[in-house]
């Protein structure tokens, strides 16, 4: 079944509303188009669902964690999360999405977030899994922690920031995953031209692509619900930006995804 897969959406959420209601149809359309999925949990419930979904087909895998915006019951959730990982280790690609989010200042204290970020890092090391990181307005703190703890296997999810941060992650040997945001129309305010430069300096063996569906729908579907199979719009955009064929770009992205994620051939 995996031999038909041509590309992998490395970060997607068919385990949450509204996509969970369309799961069977989404998976059928993805398989028909040769698209594998890494289904990502953001809390205990969606992590449980991600595992249940990933068990259904070999071209699906999943990531589990507690998102930095969902730490309200973290003490109990984290204990249950580790039990979930231990019992389902073969179906889990990485620990995520976890990390730091300073965008919503009213959510959680920075030190509190950093503590649980470190706990997720410990979990990833214990179970020998990569990290899938959500870092928003917090790159400096995240980089400091990752260096302090000598973290090696990391995917920077949904990277839309400065070229300088991309360069630091590249120097640390991390994978960078680009979302449909890159297909949006450049303006003076969205700094997309700088993001294009980040893509251009990302080594071809460290570049990944994602939808973050149902969010961040790429052009030409922007304004609609995002679906995992829209990942092809983003991969085509990257191919055009880098001046290579879409077929070659998909091959590169697939090889990278299979290298860092847990897909059983």
Curated annotation (Swiss-Prot):
Which amino acid positions bind a divalent metal cation 2, per UniProt?
A: 97, 134, 157
**Cofactor binding annotation:** Binds 2 divalent metal cations per subunit.
> Which EC class is this protein assigned?
hydrolase
Record-level GO cellular component terms: cytosol
Concerning InterPro entries, the annotation shows:
DNase_TatD-rel_CS (IPR018228), Metal_Hydrolase (IPR032466), TatD-like (IPR001130), TatD/YcfH-like (IPR015991)
The cofactors it requires, by name, are:
a divalent metal cation
A GO molecular function assigned to this protein is: DNA nuclease activity
Protein residues bound to a divalent metal cation 1: 11, 13, 97, 212
Q: Which UniProt keywords apply?
A: Hydrolase, Metal-binding
Tell whether Hydrolase is among the UniProt keywords.
yes
Q: Which CDD domains match?
A: TatD_DNAse
Q: Do you know which Pfam families this protein is assigned to?
A: TatD_DNase (PF01026)
The UniProt entry's sequence similarity note says: Belongs to the metallo-dependent hydrolases superfamily. TatD-type hydrolase family.
Q: Which NCBIfam families match?
A: YchF/TatD family DNA exonuclease
What is this protein called in UniProt?
Uncharacterized metal-dependent hydrolase UU017
Q: Which organism is it from?
A: Ureaplasma parvum serovar 3 (strain ATCC 700970)
């Amino acid at each position: 079944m995996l031999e038909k897969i041509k590309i992998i959406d490395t970060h997607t959420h068919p385990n949450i509303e509204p996509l969970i209601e369309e799961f069977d149809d989404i998976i059928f359309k993805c398989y028909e188009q040769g698209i594998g999925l890494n289904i990502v949990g953001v809390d205990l419930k969606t992590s449980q669902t991600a595992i249940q979904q990933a068990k259904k087909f070999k071209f699906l895998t999943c990531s589990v964690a507690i998102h930095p915006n969902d730490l309200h019951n973290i003490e109990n959730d984290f204990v249950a999360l580790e039990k979930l990982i231990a019992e389902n280790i073969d179906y889990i690609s990485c620990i995520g999405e976890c990390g730091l989010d300073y965008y919503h200042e009213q959510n959680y204290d920075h030190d509190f977030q950093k503590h649980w970020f470190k706990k997720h890092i410990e979990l990833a090391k214990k179970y020998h899994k990569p990290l899938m990181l959500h870092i928003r307005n917090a790159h400096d703190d995240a980089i400091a922690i990752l260096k302090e703890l000598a973290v090696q296997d990391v995917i920077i999810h949904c990277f839309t920031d400065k070229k300088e941060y991309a360069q630091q992650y590249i120097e640390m040997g991390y994978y960078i995953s680009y979302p449909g945001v890159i297909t949006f129309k450049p303006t003076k305010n969205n700094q997309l031209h700088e993001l294009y430069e980040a893509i251009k300096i990302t080594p071809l063996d460290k570049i990944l692509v994602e939808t973050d569906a149902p969010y961040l729908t790429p052009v030409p579907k922007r304004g609609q619900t995002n679906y995992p199979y829209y990942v092809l719009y983003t991969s085509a955009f990257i191919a055009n930006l880098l001046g290579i064929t879409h077929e070659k770009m998909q091959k590169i992205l697939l090889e990278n995804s299979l290298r860092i994620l847990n897909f059983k051939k």
